[in-house]
C-alpha cells in the first residue's frame, strides 16, 4: 500500500533513499528529505507491506508530468514486484499526468515496467 511520507518515517525513508546511487552522503540525504518536506511540488511516498515499510518513491510535479526522482526497494524485498506496484499506485494517483523517470531512475523504472507502457514516457 502506498502511503504519504510523514516526519515520523524520516529514518526509514532516509534508509530506503540511501540505496539510490546519488544519496550515499548523509548531508545530501538530509537535504533530499528536507526538499520533500518543504517543496510543495515534491512528494515522497512509502510502500507498506503488512507492517513493514519496504519501498520509497519520490516525485516532482511539473505541469502535465510527474517526474520520478527517487525509487527504491529494501534489498530483502526486491524481485517481488514491489517497484511495479509502486508505479501502478502512482499511475492511479496521478491519472491525468504522465509519469516520467529522470536519468537516475530510468533504469529501475524500465525494469519495473518490464516494457514501455503507452501511458508512460521516458526521458533520454
Curated annotation (Swiss-Prot):
Transmembrane segments: none annotated. It is an enzyme of class 2 (transferase). SUPFAM superfamilies: Acyl-CoA N-acyltransferases (Nat) (SSF55729). PROSITE patterns: GNAT. InterPro entries: Acyl_CoA_acyltransferase, GNAT_dom. Its EC number is 2.3.1.-. Residues 3-124 form the N-acetyltransferase domain. GO terms for molecular function: acyltransferase activity, transferring groups other than amino-acyl groups. GO terms for biological process: riboflavin biosynthetic process. Keywords: Acyltransferase, Riboflavin biosynthesis, Transferase. Pfam families: Acetyltransf_1. Involved in riboflavin biosynthesis. This is Protein RibT. It comes from Bacillus subtilis (strain 168). The lineage of its organism: Bacteria, Bacillati, Bacillota, Bacilli, Bacillales.
